[in-house]
A protein has these predicted regions:
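Active-site-adjacent loops and short helices of periplasmic peptidoglycan-processing enzymes
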Residues: 1-170
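Penicillin-recognizing serine hydrolase domain
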Residues: 3-18, 117-306
């Protein structure tokens, strides 16, 4: 279903694309197509990686200024390594997270996973592969959030012998709703660029990482992540807000209504154009619904969350 829209013009999504447009405050699905089907998600995987790291940091009271050592496995992944991390380099969790989420840095994602995974194994008194332990935490998070069409096989989304991880637009919406509740998550996804550095044998290496999501900073868009691979096509998840509506209820009370949409595009050939078009359409549909008094939404148009 296209939600009653002609799917042409305005950068609307093409055929074969999977997409979902959601009002994040009511979980109202404003527009969707092929949104329940499982497909490869490439670097969108790193959203789950980031959230597992941040949940661990909060649970263990570990500051993101903590320094991690780049593991040997980071040198064997391939794919994006925008700041040239090599095994043995030392980088803060914060800078590794910035490079992973903004510049889709595979080596930084692997570094985060190895550090957190080894801490989890140590705390539980178990041996094993730290990165495999971390991936199991990603899959546990997916299970808790009802992401039944999701399976993570690594922390970065690169295609390898065991596949590249798969999900659906609907499942990714569940993950993003959870992630957006966390201000520390949105800090990393909302910046257009950030200075990061790491230590290599006592020498500081400094870089500016630039967000691969070129829509961030326009149209109220403040996240979230890009992904692309031969099997996944072009993917992007964006979120945008508009100023709150504030109504004076008298007697000093105010009614404040926030407005935020989430747009997920998978398997595209023009992810930014399609996402921007779907966002514009989404706001039109949303405004129509609000102006009609926000009538009750049919149950099949509400994203089921867990």
């Amino acid at each position: 279903s296209t939600g009653g829209f002609p799917m042409n013009g305005g950068g609307a999504a093409g055929s074969g694309v999977s997409y979902l447009v959601l009002d994040t405050h009511s979980d109202h699905i404003l527009n969707a197509s092929n949104h329940t089907g499982r497909q490869p998600i490439a670097s969108l995987t790193k959203i789950a990686t980031a959230k597992v790291v941040l949940d661990w940091a909060a649970a263990t009271n570990t500051p993101m200024s903590t320094v991690a050592t780049v593991p040997p496995s980071a040198g064997m992944i391939g794919g994006p390594n925008p700041i040239g991390l090599a095994p043995g380099d030392r980088i803060t969790l914060r800078d590794a997270m910035s490079s992973s989420m903004m510049a889709s840095d595979n080596s930084a994602a692997e570094t985060l996973a190895a550090f957190v995974g080894s801490d989890l194994l140590r705390r539980s008194g178990r041996g094993g592969d730290p990165v495999a332990e971390f991936v199991s935490q990603m899959n546990s998070l997916a299970a808790r959030k009802g992401m039944s069409n999701t399976r993570f096989v690594n922390v970065h989304g690169m295609e390898g012998p065991s596949g590249s991880g798969s999900s659906s637009a609907e499942d990714l919406a569940r993950l993003c709703l959870y992630a957006l509740e966390d201000a520390s998550f949105t800090f990393y996804t909302s910046l257009t660029s950030r200075r990061v550095s790491y230590d290599r044998q006592g020498q500081q290496q400094a870089f500016t990482v630039t967000n691969t999501n070129s829509l961030v900073g326009s149209q109220g868009i403040d996240g979230i992540k890009t992904g692309s691979s031969p099997s996944a096509g072009e993917c992007v998840i964006i979120t945008a807000d508009r100023p709150n509506t504030v109504k004076d209820l008298g007697d000093g009370r105010k009614y404040v209504k926030p407005h935020r949409l989430l747009v997920i595009v998978l398997g595209s050939v023009n992810r930014f154009g399609e996402a921007a078009g779907l966002l514009n359409q989404g706001w039109q549909t949303y405004d129509g619904w609000i102006n009609a008094g926000s009538p009750q939404v049919p149950v099949d148009k509400i994203l089921k969350t867990y």
